[in-house]
Swiss-Prot record:
Organism: Hahella chejuensis (strain KCTC 2396)
Catalytic activity, EC: 1.5.1.5, 3.5.4.9
Residues engaged in binding NADP(+): G175, A176, S177, I241
A Pfam family the protein falls into: THF_DHG_CYH
Family of this protein: Belongs to the tetrahydrofolate dehydrogenase/cyclohydrolase family.
Superkingdom in the source lineage: Bacteria
One GO CC term, this protein: cytosol
InterPro entries referenced in this protein's UniProt entry, alphabetically: Aminoacid_DH-like_N_sf, NAD(P)-bd_dom_sf, THF_DH/CycHdrlase, THF_DH/CycHdrlase_cat_dom, THF_DH/CycHdrlase_CS, THF_DH/CycHdrlase_NAD-bd_dom
Pathway per the UniProt entry: One-carbon metabolism; tetrahydrofolate interconversion
Catalytic activity annotation: (6R)-5,10-methylene-5,6,7,8-tetrahydrofolate + NADP(+) = (6R)-5,10-methenyltetrahydrofolate + NADPH; (6R)-5,10-methenyltetrahydrofolate + H2O = (6R)-10-formyltetrahydrofolate + H(+)
Name of this chain's protein: Bifunctional protein FolD
């Protein structure tokens, strides 16, 4: 009886993504200062935005602001919606050859007349600070990561902050996108977890969630994972960010119900989101220090 009572009063500890991201950015700023103090140039990040998608404009603003805060050289290229794929590829070629630029970021989604895969593959792998290039995903799959996809790597930083040993844990990734789900599975595998990735053809999602010590959900559908499915004591990471009809921002997981069962949980907003940009800064500094020696 007491145990049930204790469990009912249980509330997960929050993983504060804002705080961890601030720590990561402070470390990057120190690294930039050390570079400049030793006579090297500041790391450079080029951000390319095509068209006028409002969400993309906000993301680009956040990224360029973060660049300036840590002392990077930040170059922003805003192209018309009507820009041809050929013109964008030409810009990428120019940035690939620019020694002041360590990272090239093309903000997604791109207009429908462009082949995003073709464009992302044109970025030199050693400047692919988003970690989307097949070369970088392949390195991660072969256990020799160089530039790692930002959101999964940021989540690994959050998991490290819990102090929980990841080896041997059963980890479940809900959602199999190229940007989050698949590389997330590879990151957890690298950390010694036993990994399951679920997708639209998965049968009996609740049973799979209820077995998992670590649950990472990245689907973009509010409440797709019910709180009652969570295994007591699990670590819950919510990558989703959805706007409800009443204007509230919510994740993919039923937060309040999940927080009653989990040991650790990320809030939305203020969980995974800030880590993506902080990790982009980390990757750009890494590229400057280790991949570009000029």
């Amino acid at each position: 009886m007491t145990m049930t009572h204790a469990q009912n009063n249980h509330h997960a500890r929050l993983i504060d993504g804002k705080q961890v991201a601030a720590d990561v950015r402070a470390n990057v700023a120190e690294g930039v200062k050390a570079r400049i103090d030793s006579g090297l140039r500041p790391p450079g990040l080029a951000v390319v935005l095509v068209g006028e998608d409002p969400a993309s404009q906000v993301y680009v603003k956040n990224k360029t602001k973060a660049c300036e805060e840590v002392g990077f050289l930040s170059q922003k290229y805003t192209l018309e919606e009507s820009t041809t794929e050929e013109e964008l590829l030409k810009l990428i070629d120019t940035l690939n050859e620019d020694n002041a630029i360590d990272g090239i970021l093309v903000q997604l989604p791109l207009p429908t007349h462009m082949d995003a895969d073709n464009i992302l593959e044109r970025i030199k792998p050693d400047k692919d600070v988003d970690g989307f290039h097949p070369y970088n995903l392949g390195r991660l799959a072969q256990r020799m990561p160089v530039l790692r996809p930002c959101t999964p790597k940021g989540i690994m930083t959050l998991l490290a902050r819990t102090g929980v040993e990841l080896r041997g844990k059963d980890a479940l990734v809900v959602g199999a996108s190229n940007i989050v789900g698949r590389p997330m599975g590879l990151e957890l595998l690298l950390a010694g977890c036993t990994v399951t990735i679920t997708h639209r053809f998965t049968v009996n999602l609740p049973a799979k969630v209820s077995q998992a010590d670590i649950v990472v959900v990245a689907v973009g559908r509010p409440g797709i994972v019910k709180g009652e499915w969570i295994k007591p004591g699990a670590i819950v990471i919510d990558v989703g960010i959805n706007r409800r009809d009443d204007g509230a921002l919510v994740g993919d997981i039923e937060f309040n119900e999940a927080a009653e069962r989990a040991s650790w949980i990320t809030p939305v907003p203020g969980g995974v989101g800030p880590m993506t940009v902080a990790t982009l800064m980390e990757n750009t500094l890494y590229a400057a220090n280790h991949l570009h020696k000029d």
